[in-house]
Amino acid sequence: MSTDAIAHEMPRLKKQYREQIRAAMQEEFGYRNPMLIPGLEKIVVNMGVGDAAHDSKVMDGAIRDITAITGQKPQVTKARKSIAQFKLREGQPIGCHVTLRGDRMWEFADRLLTLALPRIRDFRGLNSNQFDGKGNYTFGLSEQVMFLEIDQDKIVRIRGMDITFVTTAQTNEEGKALLKHLGFPFKAKDDPKKAKTKRGPAYYAKKKKK
């Protein structure tokens, strides 16, 4: 295979969406128009850095980390107004964010779902109650170390981030179905280990007779 062919090879998850997931969504929801089948529009990765307003090195580290994780240089987020109690002035840097689209979006989603999330210690799945009512989903990560692109020996500070998957779905139900097909590990609603057995009146009546 030539170098050009490799460079233009379709991302694995994008190919899976086109060849399998679209058909599965069509079967599940019965869309009359194929154009209505939901897809992934963009992914926004946001890293808040409160100390950046007073230490430029902190922001440099955040930019370096998010660039390594996403493969795209982030934009700096600045304070919209001054807050005296936090010694924050309007225009000071408070974080950074990237918006991923196209193949880079699909590649990041694939790495996140297949490599990064499984590396989280005691990971039990993502909360499925964090949709915004329009099929978009946001969740937070408390640190950056689960990403293979981060050299743990060079970590200066643990940094969390918020990740938003923006879809073209019209409802939370459709958005959740799409993300599940993409491989999102949502928590099961009922955990057999934690579920309590429901006992009706007959049980307590027998207990009283004893």
Swiss-Prot record:
It comes from the Bacteria. Residues 195-210 have a biased composition (Basic residues). Residues 188-210 are annotated as: Disordered. The keyword tRNA-binding applies. Keywords: Ribonucleoprotein, Ribosomal protein, RNA-binding, rRNA-binding, tRNA-binding. The keyword Isomerase does not apply. One of its GO terms (molecular function) is tRNA binding. Coiled coil: none annotated. One of its GO terms (biological process) is translation. One of its GO terms (cellular component) is ribonucleoprotein complex. InterPro entries: Ribosomal_uL5, Ribosomal_uL5_bac-type, Ribosomal_uL5_C, Ribosomal_uL5_dom_sf, Ribosomal_uL5_N. Belongs to the universal ribosomal protein uL5 family. This is one of the proteins that bind and probably mediate the attachment of the 5S RNA into the large ribosomal subunit, where it forms part of the central protuberance. In the 70S ribosome it contacts protein S13 of the 30S subunit (bridge B1b), connecting the 2 subunits; this bridge is implicated in subunit movement. Contacts the P site tRNA; the 5S rRNA and some of its associated proteins might help stabilize positioning of ribosome-bound tRNAs. HAMAP family: Ribosomal_uL5_B. Part of the 50S ribosomal subunit; part of the 5S rRNA/L5/L18/L25 subcomplex. Contacts the 5S rRNA and the P site tRNA. Forms a bridge to the 30S subunit in the 70S ribosome. NCBIfam families: PRK00010.1. This is Large ribosomal subunit protein uL5. It comes from Cutibacterium acnes (strain DSM 16379 / KPA171202) (Propionibacterium acnes). The gene is rplE.
